[in-house]
């Protein structure tokens, strides 16, 4: 079996490409089902965020397995493979393992050290299990990656004062507008990113904030979490009017289609009044053509790179601390991965010993008589099972823990010879 990751991110593809490959949670089940129906793909985990789509697979044949994934990506995005391929990255086994560890730790994020990605990796693991895409190998890998992410955030300084896409968006606005307290601000959307936007806007001095959302109740809940801020709430039906009265607008919704374009705005905007739009959604919420309107400036997530660059250098040294921890977690996974080679031998030995135990127990109970056997069978059963487990425990632990490949294989061959396991394994009795 081989592990691989195929995908694209803010490092390899512009937002125009990434948005075509953004998979909302509602589509993950079908995507996993389609990929798992392939001939060469045994396990699948799909990580989809605003800055990346990564498909982790366990495949029995590497090249055909990768081909199945790239074909799926091309068909899903409706981008011909020859045009999509330059934006894709592919990492195999050790490289794919380290990559997921770095992703979970925030070291591969647009905003170095951001914390939201760890929750997104956890959700990928959860959905992969729910929809039967993640099996034994990816289950262990994602658990190890989550452990790595937690360790990096608690044992290093990378998480201290870490910024997010939302905070970078507010920073960009402040760079362009300076004193945010002078501006009327609107936020379209009421999710986690919007909550962070409000938090950072208030910290920067903004005091005239409106939230626009499809569910007014959800927008009100968000406003209520900042009780002293006097935040106004509007429905999507009022969106265009509110934007027309605003100086700065952020969009952060899960909409898969554009919610703002030139046609919607040109009739309500004052051509003499400047308007700054910051779209942190993927797929994008705002069409490119709004920039054709007089006095309108529009930015998207790719425009945050300049802001992030200022923060990145000071955090690069912190990231080096984290890499040491990640090496430890990769090694821990690798030890487990290599131990899988011992599973057939261990299962075969356990099956053989269990068969002997059951046979000898049956003989003993028949000699003791039915009355005694019925009364004490459970105790004797537990006793014999306990003895077997105790005897097998240390040899099995030592066999799994043996990291030297030659030594481990020699130990397996010795066990197979001493217990005549070859015939057991070849006869299909292994469980």
Swiss-Prot record:
The active site is at 50 (nucleophile). It comes from the Bacteria. InterPro entries: 4pyrrol_synth_GluRdtase, 4pyrrol_synth_GluRdtase_dimer, 4pyrrol_synth_GluRdtase_N, GluRdtase_CS, GluRdtase_dimer_dom_sf, GluRdtase_N_sf, NAD(P)-bd_dom_sf, Shikm_DH/Glu-tRNA_Rdtase. PANTHER family: GLUTAMYL-TRNA REDUCTASE 1, CHLOROPLASTIC (PTHR43120:SF1). NADP(+) binds at residues 189-194. This is Glutamyl-tRNA reductase. GO terms for biological process: chlorophyll biosynthetic process; protoporphyrinogen IX biosynthetic process. During catalysis, the active site Cys acts as a nucleophile attacking the alpha-carbonyl group of tRNA-bound glutamate with the formation of a thioester intermediate between enzyme and glutamate, and the concomitant release of tRNA(Glu). The thioester intermediate is finally reduced by direct hydride transfer from NADPH, to form the product GSA. The gene is hemA. It is an enzyme of class 1 (oxidoreductase).
